[in-house]
Amino acid sequence: ARLENAYLGKTFKLYDGTEITFNEDNFRRMVLVYIDAIKYTINIYNSLLKSCGRNIDFEMSIDETLTPTSPESHYFVASELIKGGVEITSLAPRFCGEFQKGIDYIGDISTFEKEFIMHVKIAKTLGYKISVHSGSDKFKVFPIVGKVTEGEYHLKTAGTNWLEAVRIIAARNPALYRRMHKFALENLEEAKKYYHISADPSNIPDIDSLADSELPALMDKDDSRQVLHITYGLILKAKNQDGTYTFKDEIYSTLHKYEQDYYNSLINHIGKHLSGLGIK
């Protein structure tokens, strides 16, 4: 009853006059989807985090839902968290289109921009930043993110730093890369239990047909990028029968040996992200 009295049939104005209205259909659905997560978050924040004795950045992620986050759902979740005493630093909605691991944005750019603008308006009104998850390599939308937020955002990008490491391994230790590549393909189905990707292994050339000099270019192709991306945990944890690591130690020793190469690759890679976001 409290939620119905607070939202149902009500209209809320954002800072620029844009209105958000809750009707019976969309309201009941969003309560069913989000209320348990909201209650759990408020409990964790107030019982564990609030008393930790230091400043924290608190981010709420609602991007793992099956459908994009509507403006009404975004407003409802954030409003309820704030009423529950949660100080939100950033919130990650699920945007339209697909933010798959390791590759560029898939979807209609104009629709994304329209919906992103609305999410930013809500965040500015309620006092936190918008967060973009799986933000690595989403070059098509970076200019929109940088411009619309005026630099106030959180972009999660780390996974493709691993792919730059894989690129260095492919160039400097091709024998190790070949083993990693075959292992990744063999264990792809296990990794796909945790990540949604569109990679098609049949589009990846047979590695035994490639010369060593051709291996680094596999990190420029979407299918092989995604396969090596989502299997990183399996690759690093894999062990031999005697308990030694199958790949991990050699990966680290290779990267230590060619540390400057890896740094240069990261400077170029992250530089592309910063440039796309309008950061100079």
Residue ranges and their predicted role:
Residues 1-31, 47-48:
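Catalytic alpha/beta active-site cores
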Residues 63:
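Acidic active-site catalytic centers that drive phospho-/nucleotidyl reactions
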Residues 53-57:
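Short Gly/Ser/Thr- and Asp/Glu-enriched loop/turn motifs at secondary-structure junctions
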Residues 33, 37, 42-52, 66-280:
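Active-site capping/gating regions of soluble enzymes
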